[in-house]
């Protein structure tokens, strides 16, 4: 075998070649206006690290013997370590302004320009992958061939699913990223709509702000001078043109635009079918979007076992919580009624979550054909229940078809 060439297989050869080619293309695409990586906003202040000379490293990152010292000892001159932690820092540097992680929920929240939306589509992972693409740009701006090769090779390793998951996992605890449920939607008088944030106390509109920490959105455009003749006519019709009932409904729905729960009460809307009560509250629920939701009647009805904590979690952040159809003669659970209207903190959890608590913002509306029964005659309990009668039979086309058609946007319509 002496003197004969030996072909030693290098399994990483083609990956390194491809990475270097990508880095070279990225270098060619950089414009003269692009600053070096180390000079870009959000990079580290290198005064935080020991001078390279004290570590036996020159300004190219090389030593006389062995691999470049910055591969695992100190952050390189252009940015972060070539480690999973370094990638987490890259992610936060590039996208941290728009990312928060709620540990009790185990969920990322992403700023979408209007609110902090829970990540249900993998947006956090997409941003992590974009961060890896940025490593190739780091390679393009490297000060030496050694740096370029090291960065290109590391970028390939970072494309593994396990490396992406590790980047996100480490980033969850980085400063400024963790957030608790109590900090979200904390101002009960702010209402997020498509064209800004409304202060419900003053009626003023301003731009969306990250600092408000709002997670909800009402999918409508706020116009304080808008008129609603169809809505007004509908209220007149289903409430028998009674000014007292009409005024009450307007006040109650306005109250439901806020997170204020100081009235400590709920509404029971009752009456036989086709009287407009479900159309009224379902239409309003669609108008306020994320601020409204349905809850199971097991939250309110007397039963052998206490309601599951996941049912209480559905109340979090709601301003209108609708419960429907309890059946004739069903008993309301007095302790649940008091608990859910008291304004006290509520403990809850979702599946595979630890318990967490929240300040209530919901107003309960139960609509049913038959008013439920309450066993007690205690005045304190009955004071929490406001009965709203719907006595008139409304034409089906008006209550169930015409009103939604005029009030709510449908696909492919202007």
Task: State each model region's role.
Residues 50-220, 395-396:
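Intein modules and their embedded homing endonuclease domains
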Residues 295-308, 335-354, 397-409, 413:
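Substrate-gripping "pore-loop 1 plus following alpha2 helix"
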Residues 310-317, 349-367:
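AAA+/SF3 P-loop NTPase mechanochemical coupling elements
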Residues 319-343, 356, 374-381:
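Conserved AAA+/SF3 P-loop NTPase catalytic/coupling segment centered on the Walker-B
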């Amino acid at each position: 075998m002496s003197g004969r060439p030996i072909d030693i297989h290098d399994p990483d050869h083609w990956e390194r070649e491809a990475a270097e080619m990508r880095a070279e293309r990225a270098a060619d695409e950089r414009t003269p206006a692009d600053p070096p990586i180390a000079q870009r906003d959000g990079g580290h202040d290198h005064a935080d690290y020991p001078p390279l000379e004290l570590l036996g490293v020159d300004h190219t990152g090389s030593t006389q013997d062995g691999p470049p010292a910055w591969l695992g000892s100190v952050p390189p001159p252009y940015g972060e370590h070539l480690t999973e932690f370094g990638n987490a820092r890259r992610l936060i540097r590039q996208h941290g302004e728009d990312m928060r992680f709620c540990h009790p929920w185990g969920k990322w929240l992403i700023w979408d320009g209007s609110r902090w939306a829970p990540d249900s589509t993998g947006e956090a992972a997409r941003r992590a992958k974009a961060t890896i693409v940025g490593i190739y740009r780091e390679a393009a701006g490297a000060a030496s061939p050694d740096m370029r090769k090291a960065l290109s090779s590391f970028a390939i390793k970072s494309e593994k699913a396990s490396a992406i998951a590790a980047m996100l996992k480490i980033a969850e605890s980085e400063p400024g990223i963790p957030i608790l449920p109590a900090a979200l939607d904390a101002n009960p008088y702010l209402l997020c709509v498509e064209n800004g944030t409304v202060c419900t106390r003053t009626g003023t509109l301003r731009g969306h702000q990250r600092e408000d920490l709002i997670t909800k959105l009402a999918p409508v455009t706020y116009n304080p001078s808008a008129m609603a003749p169809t809505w007004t006519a509908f209220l007149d019709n289903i409430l028998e043109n009674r000014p007292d009932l009409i005024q009450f409904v307007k006040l109650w729905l306005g109250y439901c635009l806020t997170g204020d729960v100081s009235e400590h009460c709920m509404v029971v809307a009752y009456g036989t079918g086709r009287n407009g009560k479900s159309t009224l509250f379902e239409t309003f629920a669609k108008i306020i979007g994320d601020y409204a939701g349905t809850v199971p009647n097991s939250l309110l009805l007397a039963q052998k076992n206490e309601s599951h904590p996941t049912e209480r979690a559905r109340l979090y952040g709601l301003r209108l919580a609708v419960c429907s159809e309890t059946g004739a003669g069903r008993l309301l659970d007095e302790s649940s009624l008091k608990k859910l209207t008291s304004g006290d903190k509520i403990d809850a959890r979702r599946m595979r979550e630890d318990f967490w608590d929240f300040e209530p913002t919901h107003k309960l509306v139960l609509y049913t054909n038959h008013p439920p029964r309450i066993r007690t005659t205690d005045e304190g309990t009955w004071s929490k229940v406001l009965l709203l009668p719907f006595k008139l039979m409304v034409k089906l086309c008006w209550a169930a078809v015409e009103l939604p058609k005029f009030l709510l946007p449908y696909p492919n319509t202007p």
